[in-house]
């Protein structure tokens, strides 16, 4: 038997041995520490692994076990999932690859042809797949949702979410909830009208759609000036969270359009820059909380929600915590959406604070003007889409934080909208003498107080990841992959990957050994303890 045939037979055996991922397995993902079954590791958005074979005492013995270079030259923003020893990862724009999680040996690759006229704001990227049963689900930059056979990469169904020619795309990893695939969309910079969709996992038929901008006559439409709601943005371009006990999906919404010009869309612009809580079965709105009303700065609420059950002021509460792009850390009751507290975690000059009702107190002098106004944080925010992590052991939230400013200048005159074209209302610039700084920060989960921080040379675009070994893993723009003591931020280990890190690490176990995988540059790097 030749080598290639042997490899093919072994691959077929490994793929066949991988178990079906039921909804019950997803509900109990924490009980399967050897797998990484969802984008955030669990429905609560924790990015926490219960594995502790790799820990503070032996992390210096980490070494690279394998690397896999993608064919795409674009940076990876994917979060791989791992199911029973099989890793599934995406590469730009919309390829999926199945790998042996122990060796990096590829099993199959799905390659999708993307139309030449696809336009996206910030790169033709993809952040991952979702699995249910033996099917993988992926959104595409030409605004489709695709179901693939996890054993072969064969297309099972392919449905259009919406018309990409109007500026829509799907870049986020979907979220499986019961028998539905929840899909958000990108395109806020094109003046789209945002929505969140649910699709039947078996057939691909759409089950419900929630528009993040209320239509004419609907509650909330009065928060938009005239017809500005029709091109108001509020996309849903980062994966959300789910509470099965409450049957609520929590999802962040993006900035109102056009960017950097609030005067032509006067009002709060609901439900932009918000967290929305939707009934998982119907898509009906249960509650919302808006972080930045009438946003003139482009501060999407594009962060993964973190759900925490904790005692708050002497009472057990179901909480949702959020380190927002606007530089404030929020604690809300996730049953009702009640605002509980907020604290700035990065330098900010735009607000005098958050009032007792949870509404920001804008500083009038910080509103953008045609002459330009210097405001902290800058247009990309105090943090961005890259995921935070939460450890139930330390009760800390770990966030990649930026400290910098932009000069905001809105355009004057008419701003006509053309479907499929960029819809900008101004321009932000960075002061030459102040490029800004960055850090990994550990925040108290209930107050947002900074407990420790580790400075970075540049504004890193990677998320954090934490383990039961009390290690926080993080990568930066220089390609350094680092492990910190989760309690005090001490740097314990560092390796160079040679590529910009623009994603988060994950951990899993195969044949009794723990591994850590990091997407960096256009490659996957996997580390384990030296044998």
Predicted regions and their residues:
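Blade/loop signatures of beta-propeller domains
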Residues: 21-64, 212-219, 359-364, 429-430, ...
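Short coil/turn segments that connect the beta-strands within blades of beta-propeller domains
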Residues: 33-34, 84-85, 133-134, 178-180, ...
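N-terminal cofactor/phosphate-binding cores enriched in small/glycine residues
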Residues: 45, 49-162, 467
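Extracytoplasmic beta-rich repeat domains
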Residues: 68-79, 109-130, 158-173, 190, ...
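Beta-propeller blade signature
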Residues: 148, 194-205, 268-283, 335-337, ...
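Loop/turn-rich, solvent-exposed surfaces of beta-rich toroidal or solenoidal domains
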Residues: 309, 402, 432-490
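Blade-level signature of beta-propeller repeat domains, shared across WD40, Kelch, NHL, RCC1
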Residues: 503-531
